[in-house]
Every structure is written in structure tokens, then in C-alpha cells.
């Protein structure tokens, strides 16, 4: 499976396969845990084997019942996930020409994981936040996140949190003039069409509103784009990294 991931990435085909498969790996670990087992050695490459195109985990070590407290059990499960992600982090770094930095979305994902690890989150929360990261989502899931964050931007209970994040985090500095003439002129025609349909300022709030509307137009009016993958690719090209930065600032 991981070989597929890299082949797909390198050939720039089927990015979707790439992302879902990584998510499946994390889900698979959750299934081991739900059976009352833990692995205990996922930091070591000797516990993985490739069979065909699939990466299999071998040498599952033990039973969570060996531990006396819930806290120990939770820590053990969490350690499995961090070990798996640590292994993948090293692996991506070594296999991608130029390292992870050459694949911005991948870099964002591992930065997120490393930040989440420092926050002492419960196992369930940690696993969910990691598995729901935009890097692991398909096009529709990624674009739907803009809808969710724009909803939070307007909802009374979350408005303040979103406003503070968007205005105070330096992560958004790069997006403050997202609507420059050169960007707008370079956009694919369906993106420009949605842009010209309303008045948008160069503020980050309006960028979020625009992306929400892009998703809305696709679903409500059948956009000229053809598929959500094409919409997602356009967004990833012209407004690269914005979704990942939103996720980082609004999810933890
Ligand atoms: C954009 O704003 C201008 C000035 O406020 C207004 O005249 C125009 O009708 C607006 N356009 C749209 C598409 O809302
Ligand atoms: C970008 O937004 C600013 C307002 O913040 C507006 O004056 C400008 O015309 C917009 N640029 C384009 C290319 O639409």
C-alpha cells in the first residue's frame, strides 16, 4: 500500500488513493485497539512487511489488559499511533526527493502531528484529529472543511474563536492579499467565475467565504469544473496551504 502511495505521488496520478490509504492505516490501528490489543513496537521497521502492494503490521505484542490503569492503556494506544506516524515521517523524509518540504501538504501533516503530540490530548481525540487531517481526505472532504469553518466563522458560539485565529496567527500572513490581480487572472475560469459573482475583499475572512461559495456553487449549480477533484486541485494550486493552516489553527 505504501509503495502505491509513493508511486501515485511521484507519477502525480491518483492523489486521492494516496491520502485515503494513509487514513486506512490509522483506522486499522484503531481496530487493533478496539479488540483490546496494542502493538508496542511500531517505531521499528522490523515490525512492518510489504506483501505485494500492501504494508502489513506484524508482531503485535500484547493485550491491553496487562495494564492496571485506564491511563496506562490509553497511553499505550496513543504510543502506537505516534510510533506509526513517526515511522512514516522518517520514511517520507527519506523517500521524497528534497524531503517532506518538497510536498507542502505532507510537511503540514507531520507538523500538525508533532504539535498535537505535545498537547496531551486523550487517545480518541488525538486519533480523530490526526485521521481527519485534510492531507488524508479526498477532494470532497477537503472542500467540505471550508464549509464547516465558514459556518463556525458565522455561528455565535464559535465566531470569536475563528476571528481571533484568523487575525492573530501569523500563519495567515501569506494569504492576506489572496485576491491579487495576478492570482485572480491566473485562476481557472470556474474559480474566477465564482470570484466575480460577489464582492470579495483581500481579507482572510473573505477568502474563507469565497472557498465556501466555491463548494456551494459546485453542489448547487453544477459548476463548469467537472468534478470536485478539479475544484480541489485548483484551490491547492492557487491558495496552497490555506486549508492545512486553518485546520491547525481551528482544530487544536
Ligand atoms: C460590489 O460592490 C459595489 C460597490 O459597493 C456595488 O456597486 C456592486 O453592485 C457590487 N457587486 C456585486 C456583484 O455585488
Ligand atoms: C481585492 O480586494 C480589494 C479589497 O480588499 C479590492 O480593492 C481589489 O479590487 C480586489 N482585487 C481584485 C483583483 O479583485
Which residue ranges define each predicted feature?
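Regulatory extensions appended to serine/threonine kinase catalytic cores
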Residues: 141-252
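Conserved structural core of kinase catalytic domains
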Residues: 1-16
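Activation segment signature within eukaryotic-like protein kinase domains
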Residues: 21-22
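Short, flexible/disordered secondary-structure transition segments
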Residues: 33-44, 99, 123-127, 137-145
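C-lobe/activation-segment region of protein kinase-like
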Residues: 54-120, 125-127
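Catalytic-loop of the protein kinase fold
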Residues: 29-52, 57
